[in-house]
Design a protein with these regions (language model features):
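Active-site-proximal or metal-binding-adjacent scaffold patches in catalytic folds
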Residues: 1-137, 146-184
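Walker B catalytic acidic pair
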Residues: 142
């Protein structure tokens, strides 16, 4: 089977590939890598690509029919999310003894939250549509990065200390995340 893919060249150092939710294959490559080398890279991973594309298409079947939010609905959801998330950030930062910078609420299609090296926190507005425990988990997860900017055992121990049932919350996001993010 001939594998179709798009190439994105940048100042990166390594080759990588990603299967997008719509089943398209994106190859990310350093500017100095030739198209022939990229072709060999794709060929060497063709079995994995075919299997992954099929899995992604089955998993995301029907997501294109999900009703997208309007700009107005997104603005309202962002305000609601901020009102729900800020008290949790304040509560857990105090409890965990960590500081943070600015807090942003965004409509992100791939992340539930993030923490920069400067301590700035970003949260997905879609968290407002999740159970409160899930929202608490994402807040604890991001604030734990204020002590551990990685996903080491120590990091996960800290998450578990403040959110003993974090695995359940994480599972909720794994099971429902694609459907929620399809609304953006």
């Amino acid at each position: 089977m001939e594998i179709e893919y798009t190439i994105e060249k940048s100042h990166r150092r390594t080759l990588s590939m990603e299967v997008k939710p719509d089943g398209t294959v994106m190859i990310k490559a350093p500017k100095f890598v030739s198209d022939a080398e990229i072709g060999r890279f794709v060929s060497s991973r063709s079995d994995w690509i075919e299997k992954t594309v099929k899995k992604v298409l089955v998993k995301n079947a029907g997501l294109s029919e999900v009703e997208r939010m309007t700009d107005t609905e997104l603005r309202v959801l962002k305000r609601k999310a901020r009102a729900m998330i800020m008290p949790l950030v304040e509560e857990y930062a105090d409890l965990m003894g960590v500081t943070y910078g600015t807090v942003s609420i965004r409509a992100q299609k791939t992340r539930w939250g993030s923490c920069s090296s400067k301590g700035n926190l970003n949260f997905n507005c879609l968290l407002a549509l999740c159970p409160e425990g899930v929202m608490r988990y994402v807040v604890v997860h991001e604030l734990s990065h204020r002590r551990h900017m990685n996903h080491s055992k120590t990091f996960w121990s800290m998450v578990e200390e403040y959110m003993p049932d974090y695995k359940e919350q994480k599972l909720y996001l794994k099971r429902n995340g694609d459907l929620l993010m399809a609304r953006l």
